[in-house]
Amino acid sequence: MESLRITDDLENIDPNIRIEKHIDNFEDTRIYFMFYIFKSQDSPIFIWVSDSPTFSTLSVSMKIPIEKSPVTSHLLESNSITSNDSSNSLSQRIVIKFKVQTFLSYSISQDIPEMSHFIEKTIFDLLSKYLKK
């Protein structure tokens, strides 16, 4: 058990993954963003967005040849229907824009349309920057 350790520096352990973190504020709410980006171009991305240290939803979205729009599924659902719906629709839009399979955990406690728009814009801006590297 002594050799067991928790680290936030995964990149030093595995050079095939890059972790990007971002904190932003919407009015009085602090919003945390974390991106796990694998170095292989065919690999999915994992995005965690939350206003608290929780992991209550997880959806996956991907483009498949027989469907016109990306298919989405909940892997972990919260009690909040709004959070589940936001996670699904946002992960679909990420797949459409960036053409990459997406795992998204979206745990925002408030259902404010302006905040949702702010979060989506922030994610898209950050992904545009991170996926170019």
Curated annotation (Swiss-Prot):
Domain of life from the UniProt record: Eukaryota
Gene Ontology biological process: proteasome assembly
Pfam families for this protein: PAC4 (PF16093)
Keywords: Chaperone
Function as written in the Swiss-Prot or TrEMBL entry: Chaperone protein which promotes assembly of the 20S proteasome.
Family: Belongs to the PSMG4 family.
Name recorded for this polypeptide: Proteasome assembly chaperone 4
